[in-house]
UniProtKB/Swiss-Prot annotation:
GO CC list: plasma membrane
Entry GO MF terms: phosphatidate cytidylyltransferase activity
Catalytic activity from the UniProt record: a 1,2-diacyl-sn-glycero-3-phosphate + CTP + H(+) = a CDP-1,2-diacyl-sn-glycerol + diphosphate
The organism of origin for this protein: Staphylococcus haemolyticus (strain JCSC1435)
Compartments (UniProt record): Cell membrane
Protein name: Phosphatidate cytidylyltransferase
Transferase recorded as keyword: yes
Taxonomic lineage: Bacteria, Bacillati, Bacillota, Bacilli, Bacillales
Source superkingdom: Bacteria
Protein family: Belongs to the CDS family.
Amino acid sequence: MKVRTLTAIIALLIFLPILLMGGTTLMLFAYLLALIALKELLNMNMIKLISVPGIFSALALIIIMLPQSAGDWVSNIQLKSLIAMSFILLSYTVLSKNRFSFMDAAFCLMSVAYVGIGFMYFYATRSDGLHYILYAFLVVWLTDTGAYIFGRLMGKHKLWPVISPNKTIEGFIGGLICSLIVPIVMLFFVDFNLNIWLLLLVTIILSIFGQLGDLVESGFKRHFGVKDSGRILPGHGGILDRFDSFMFVLPLLNILLIQM
């Protein structure tokens, strides 16, 4: 418990100033986190980052995360890079004499999309306003807190025991309820250009998909037989263990709130 608490304090001391600064500093930080998350995901499938598929996956990730504000050429190069990566990885299945399989190639492509889109929206959301990223983090944190408290106090019905045995339906509902505190409080300080009822609806959707994102990563770990995605955060696991909910929440936040 002491290790977990100390890790959280150190992480916050590093993370919060970078989040407040935003800009290029945050973008580079997002790239670093994304590369670590990609490494964690590939490691689950016994694919090393320093390997032919690992290196091409990392290059594709970097391109996928290019800021859309840089111009129309970004979308064009992103599409071409994914097409090129598909051909390269499929060709490598032949060159490796099927030691690197078709399923491995598909896994690399999925990993790049999953991690790249999530972390691209991490810095993109901050660029749209500090209040948006704070809103996202608070929704996820209060959802997690509510799910834990309600699950411990009232949890009797398993939510999805095959994937995550400790999660309960009561915890799921408790997370939704606690997440609603965020918009109610933030509206006193921030104008989201949205009425309270729509913002509450958006919050419920984000809370649901945040918990779904958590279950998706739990599914990855259970499928590959690992407890944590990594060890970089003592007491907490890996980067994916901390950011799994945000992989779903941040893109949805942009679609439902920022781009409306």
